[in-house]
Amino acid sequence: MNRALHEKPELTNARADFYGRMAEQSMTPLWEVLHTLLSDAPVTDATPHKWDYDLCRPYIMESADVISAAEAERRVMVLENPTLEGRSCITEALYAGLQLIMPGEVAPAHRHSPAALRFIVEGSGAYTAINGEKAYMEVGDLILTPSWVWHDHGHDGDVPVVWLDGLDIPLVRHLGPVFAEPYPEAEFPKGRPTGDNVARYGGNMLPFGDTYSSQNSPVFHYPYTQTRETLETLAKSGDTDPRHGIKLEYINPTTGGPVMPTIATYMQMLPKEFSGDAYQTTAAWVYHCVEGSGQTIINGDTIEWKAKDTFVVPAWYKHEHRTNGDSFLFSFTDQPVQKKLGLFREAA
C-alpha cells in the first residue's frame, strides 16, 4: 500500500483555539507545517538564470564613477537570483558577484570567516594579496581567499579588471559563525614573493619537513594557462564523459579534496558540437563561460551562453550542455558541504 507524504490537516474551531493557547508558550503544532518541511524531492526557491556580460558590463564600468574601491570596501555588483530578491545570493547557500578594480586603486585589506574565490573575467595587471603574497590576475585564473586569511586587492596595470566573486556567505550566515575584521592599514604588509604558494605546493612536491595542515588549499593561484593546457592534453585521448565532456576539479594538493571545505571548483572542456546527457544533483552549480558558446537546457528551458556570461543551475534541476564550438566552462558548487553531511545525491 502506497502512502502519501503528510498533508495539512483540516483546521477546526477546536484546533484553532488549541493552537492559539499553545502559542502563548511559544509552541506550534508540527502537523500544521510538516507538509512544508518534508518533500519527496529537494525544493529550492532559486531559479535558473543567466547574466549576460554584455548587458552587465556598462553598469560595472559606471560603478567606478559612482563609488571608489576604498569607500565601497569591495565594489561588487551582486548577481542576485531573481526569485531570491533582497537576499544577496545566487542560491540559498552561495553568493556571486562581479567586482571591478581600476588602475591605481586598492581595495583595503580585511578578513572574514566566509570563504571566497575570484575568477578573472576581464583585464590584467591587478592582483590579490593573500597574507601579503601577491597573485597577479589574468583572464581565466582562479584565485582563492579562504576563510580568515588577510587579503587585499590592488592594480598596477592600466586597464579595468573584473572578476567573478563566489562565496559561501548565505550558508555561513544561516549557520551563524560570521566574523569579519578590517586590517588597520589599507594594505597588509608584504609577504612571501609572488608565486611562492605555487612553487611550494603546486609542483607535485612538498617541502621537506612541511607540517601544513588545513582543509583550505595552500595553493591560492591556479593560472588558466596551465588549466587549459591540461584539458587540451586530455582531450587528445578522446575520453569524453557523456555528461561533462572533460571536467577537472581544482584541488587542495595536500588532501586531494576540494580547494575549500564548503566550495568545490571545476573547469571543463566541451568539444565542438557536444550534446551532453542530463545531469541532476542535490548541489547547486554556478557556471561561467571562459571561451566558446553554447546552450544549457535546464528542466526543459534553454539558456544561451557565450564567453564571460554567468548562469546558475539550482539544486535538483536537470541540465545538459550543448556547444557550438570548443568551449570552456568554469563552475563552483556547494557540493562539498553536502558530501561531508552525507546528503549529496546524483540522479542515475
Identify the meaning behind each predicted range:
Residues 130, 136-157, 163-168, 298, ...:
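Conserved metal-binding segment of the jelly-roll/cupin
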Residues 1-91, 188-262, 266:
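A short, N-terminal "cap"/entry segment at the start of jelly-roll beta-barrel domains
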Residues 84-95, 102-117, 132, 255-264, ...:
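A short beta-loop-beta micro-motif enriched in histidine and acidic residues
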Residues 254-257, 263, 267-269, 282, ...:
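C-terminal structured domain segments across diverse proteins
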Residues 102-139, 145-149, 154, 279-307:
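A short beta-strand-loop-beta hairpin characteristic of the jelly-roll/cupin
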Residues 275, 288-294, 316, 334-337:
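Hydrophobic alpha-helix feature that most strongly marks membrane-spanning transmembrane helices
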Residues 2-15, 156-216, 220, 323-348:
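Double-stranded beta-helix
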